[in-house]
């Protein structure tokens, strides 16, 4: 009934348990039906949330490229193309989506559905999320509200996208060729220092503390 996020066709469910945001495996839907005419008439905030969730696939893709080149998470071509091939077109007309244009609402919806299918294909949220979603999860764990109301997933991801993109631009401005890797590693905090900081930040929050120490 609304193009509000990409989870409709995804395999997993991101749930807050004991104060922590965790992703649980769950069966994907056998089928999905969306009427673009109905979706185009949904509250504008829902479409805006979906647009923000979909535009997050841009910095998420950059994160995946970094993970691939560093040998941490290899890019899966099939799921990559499910998300990225139609992304530009799906994001091409935000004003028209806001105005309730049926055709462009359908394109946005297709982009979100393909993102969910990509997560199904890889059994991972990697094709559809990156650092920007980590911001959203942190805010979920803090019960973020605006004017007394909980903030939608898409809006949180949208703000996370701005922060993630700024971080990527900051990285691109650095002189990587002359980076002294050994000096950077030497300057990194020891585990003892990190553990002390984690225990201070999550004091009084046992669930958060256990997750912080684990990760």
Where do the language-model regions lie?
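Active-site segments that bind and position negatively charged phosphate/pyrophosphate groups
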Residues: 80-214
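A glycine/threonine-rich phosphate-anchoring loop and its flanking beta-alpha core
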Residues: 2-89
């Amino acid at each position: 009934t609304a193009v509000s996020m990409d989870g409709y066709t995804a395999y997993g469910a991101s749930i807050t348990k004991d104060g922590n945001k965790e992703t649980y495996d769950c069966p994907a839907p056998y089928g999905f039906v969306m009427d673009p005419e109905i979706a185009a008439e949904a509250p504008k905030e829902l479409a805006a949330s979906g647009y923000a969730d979909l535009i997050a696939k841009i910095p998420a893709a950059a994160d995946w490229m970094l993970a691939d080149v560093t040998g941490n998470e290899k890019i899966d071509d099939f799921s990559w193309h499910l998300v990225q091939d139609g992304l530009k077109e799906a994001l091409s007309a935000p004003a028209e989506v806001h105005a309730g244009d049926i055709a462009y609402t359908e394109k946005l919806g297709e982009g979100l559905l393909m993102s969910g299918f990509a997560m199904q294909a890889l059994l991972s949220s990697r094709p559809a999320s990156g650092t920007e979603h980590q911001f959203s999860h942190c805010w979920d764990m803090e019960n973020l509200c605006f004017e007394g109301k909980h903030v939608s997933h898409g809006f949180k991801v949208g703000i996370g996208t701005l922060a993630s993109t700024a971080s990527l631009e900051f990285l691109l401005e650095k002189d990587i060729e002359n980076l002294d890797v050994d000096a950077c590693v030497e300057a990194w905090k020891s585990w003892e220092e990190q553990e002390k900081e984690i225990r201070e930040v999550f004091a009084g929050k046992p669930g958060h503390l256990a997750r912080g120490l684990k990760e």
